[in-house]
């Protein structure tokens, strides 16, 4: 097992990507290369950046990848809002995704703070 796989925040990011894939399966076929693809790519980017960042030799470098992962998470929030407004995402689906985003955001913020506050 790689070290990043032991991180609870990485495990939660994988779960979040699963949630995004499940929810976007219900989107119209016309969005296959639009919001569906964008949301999935952004969701996958979260765990990918955590994995890549964990390989860096310094804590500030890892923290930068956590920051990028957070940006990807915020992309998903924006895309979910658009999806809801367009009628592709139900209120229940949106709330489920938003709640998962809030949890993931707190975890990413905590990891970033710990990386920047700890000695290298």
Map each language-model feature to its residues:
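Amphipathic alpha-helical assembly/interaction segments
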Residues: 1-120
């Amino acid at each position: 097992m790689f070290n990043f796989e032991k991180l609870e925040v990485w495990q939660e990011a994988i779960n979040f990507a699963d949630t995004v894939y499940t929810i976007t399966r219900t989107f119209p076929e016309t969005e296959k290369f639009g919001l569906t693809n964008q949301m999935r790519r952004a969701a996958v980017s979260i765990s990918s950046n955590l994995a890549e960042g964990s390989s860096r030799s310094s804590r500030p470098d890892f923290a930068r990848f956590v920051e990028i992962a957070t940006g990807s998470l915020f992309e998903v929030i924006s895309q979910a809002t658009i999806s809801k407004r367009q009628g592709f995402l139900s209120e229940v689906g949106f709330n489920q995704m938003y709640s998962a985003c809030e949890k993931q955001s707190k975890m990413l913020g905590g990891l970033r703070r710990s990386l920047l506050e700890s000695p290298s």
